[in-house]
């Protein structure tokens, strides 16, 4: 009897079937969003309502859902001047956030973000480097439904050294609170190079068709992850400047069958 109990206790472990193994989580595309950016600082002409109407027509044709703009000039107290931010928001039926960089005698300069999705919050930061004058970074958190998307619209100091640019990028990276959340940076970003301060970003230029990157008025970097990837990218010419356009895929984890 003792021998029988000993053999029973040493019997082979039960066979594990495929159905007993937990299913692996696979990212599943749940939403695609189109993000674009443009820098108006080099436009050099007064922007009229008709210019904004034509620009809006292009945005609608391209189905842009989030737009980051740099180099905006506003005259809020001059009634004869068309306000770019307010007029574009009306034309596109978009929410918007504006980050003022400087105000000189009623002439405001700054950056903005427009979105068809609700804007949760916005925050502005100045750059603490010697070459900075009035340059700032505008961070906007957008509720895209399946997850929040963070967009930064910025003008970096034009005369910044390599070390100063690295410090500016660290300032921008501080906006990113969750490593898995979609994070996009737009503006006069430097030519991408491998360094500890830049390696957390991916330059959209690698996804653009050959030659089109030279047309960009505003560059786009992003933090790529398993749940946030570029689907396609291109540039689009407009009278106000060349748009950099990126379609991003937002993914969620789903179990395999």
Where are these regions (language model features)?
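Sec-dependent signal peptide recognition
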Residues: 1-2
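C-terminal motif of bacterial Sec signal peptides marking the signal peptidase cleavage site
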Residues: 7-9
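Active-site regions of metal-assisted phosphoester/phosphodiester hydrolases
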Residues: 11-62, 95-98, 102-257
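Hydrophobic alpha-helical segments
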Residues: 33, 65-66, 86
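Proline-aspartate-enriched helix->loop->beta-strand connector
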Residues: 63-72
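A generic structural signal for ordered alpha-helices
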Residues: 66, 92-93
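Glutamine-centric residue-chemistry signal
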Residues: 70, 84, 164-168
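Metal-dependent catalytic neighborhoods of phosphoester/phosphodiester hydrolases
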Residues: 72-90, 106-108, 194-200
């Amino acid at each position: 009897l003792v021998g029988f109990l000993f053999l029973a206790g040493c019997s082979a472990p039960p066979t594990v079937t495929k159905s007993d193994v937990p299913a692996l989580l696979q990212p599943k595309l749940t939403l695609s969003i189109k993000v674009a950016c443009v820098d108006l600082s080099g436009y050099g002409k007064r922007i009229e309502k008709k210019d904004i109407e034509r620009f809006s027509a292009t945005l609608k044709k391209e189905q842009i859902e989030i737009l980051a703009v740099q180099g905006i000039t506003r005259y809020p107290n001059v009634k004869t001047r068309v306000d770019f931010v307010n007029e574009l928001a009306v034309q596109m039926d978009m929410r918007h956030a504006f980050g003022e960089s400087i105000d000189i005698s009623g002439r405001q300069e700054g950056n903005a973000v427009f979105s068809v999705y609700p804007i949760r919050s916005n925050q502005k930061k100045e750059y603490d480097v010697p070459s900075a004058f009035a340059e700032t970074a505008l961070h906007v958190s957008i509720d895209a439904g399946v997850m929040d998307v963070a967009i930064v619209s910025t003008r970096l100091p034009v005369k910044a050294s390599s070390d100063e640019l690295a410090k500016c990028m660290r300032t921008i990276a501080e906006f990113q609170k969750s490593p898995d959340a979609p994070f996009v940076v737009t503006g006069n970003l430097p030519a991408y190079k491998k360094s500890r301060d830049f390696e957390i970003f991916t330059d959209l230029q690698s996804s653009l068709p050959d030659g089109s990157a030279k047309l960009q008025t505003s560059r786009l970097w992003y933090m790529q992850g398993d749940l946030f990837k570029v689907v396609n990218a291109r540039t689009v010419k407009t009278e106000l400047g060349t748009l950099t356009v990126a379609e991003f895929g937002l993914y969620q984890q789903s179990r395999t069958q």
